[in-house]
Amino acid sequence: MAVGVFDSGLGGLTVLDAVQRRLPEVPFVYFGDNAHAPYGVRDADDIFALTCAATERLWAEGCDLVILACNTASAAALKRMQESWIPRDKRVLGVFVPLIEALTERQWGDNSPPREVAVKHVALFATPATVASRAFQRELAFRAIGVDVEAQPCGGVVDAIEQGDEILAEALVRSHVEALKRRMPHPQAAILGCTHYPLMEATFQEALGPEVTVYSQANLVAESLADYLARRPEFVGQGTESKFLTTGDPRSVSNKATQFLRRRITFEAA
């Protein structure tokens, strides 16, 4: 039994860390497509092709259920994958769903009409590709009415985090928050719509101010996955061991990942 976790780089490790803590008995196979990162500047067809290739690799590892722990892939590829590509005995889940459930306080299976929610002004921080897809706004509109979403494409942040340049990453986050607040001075909530961003959560919160509720994905996804597997245990796949795979240089990626999570992580070539 194993569950696959995919990201274009290292950001998905924030999700992996949370799901491992929540489900310690489940083996997880992590696949980082570091050779092609970042996805946030690629076009939708490119993202679709790369995401399908990574998903197939995780299926080959015995993971019948794959989590796209990458907002760009979830936004630009998942809908198309679910409509035309995923076989009936497999499942691929994105990371938007738990966020929208938390924001709208309604479950995913709730198909009642959209309704008013408490939060009216939402700031979305994400990669340029995620912002361009408008996937978050589309999914939110199915569930809530009267919510104003202001999206800020956060160019450069993922690269700075992947390169371990914390000072640059912090400066970029502050600059992106300032840019958004010029358009939406008083957001009630902020969505960190990239799995790299939880590492910068304190900086986002500080720049936004204490009155803004910041939604970060890792723990929300972990709770959602635990709930899903309780309802659908047949999708815990045949794999039996946890491992870390990368399309990049395993040694370099292992070193960065170890810095990233502050515990030893060893990647092998995918």
UniProtKB/Swiss-Prot annotation:
Q: Which reaction does it catalyse?
A: L-glutamate = D-glutamate
Give the transmembrane region(s).
none
Q: Which UniProt keywords apply?
A: Cell shape, Cell wall biogenesis/degradation, Isomerase, Peptidoglycan synthesis
Q: Name one GO biological process term.
A: regulation of cell shape
Q: What is its EC number?
A: 5.1.1.3
Q: Where are the active-site residues found?
A: C70 (proton donor/acceptor), C194 (proton donor/acceptor)
The cross-references to PROSITE patterns, in alphabetical order and at most eight, read: ASP_GLU_RACEMASE_1
Q: Which SUPFAM superfamilies match?
A: Aspartate/glutamate racemase
Q: Name one Pfam family in it.
A: Asp_Glu_race
Gene3D superfamilies linked: 3.40.50.1860
Gene Ontology molecular function, alphabetical: glutamate racemase activity
What enzyme category does the UniProt record give?
isomerase
Q: In which pathway does it act?
A: Cell wall biogenesis; peptidoglycan biosynthesis
Name the protein family: Belongs to the aspartate/glutamate racemases family.
Q: Which HAMAP family match?
A: Glu_racemase
Query: Which named protein is this?
Result: Glutamate racemase
The species this protein was found in? Cereibacter sphaeroides (strain ATCC 17025 / ATH 2.4.3)
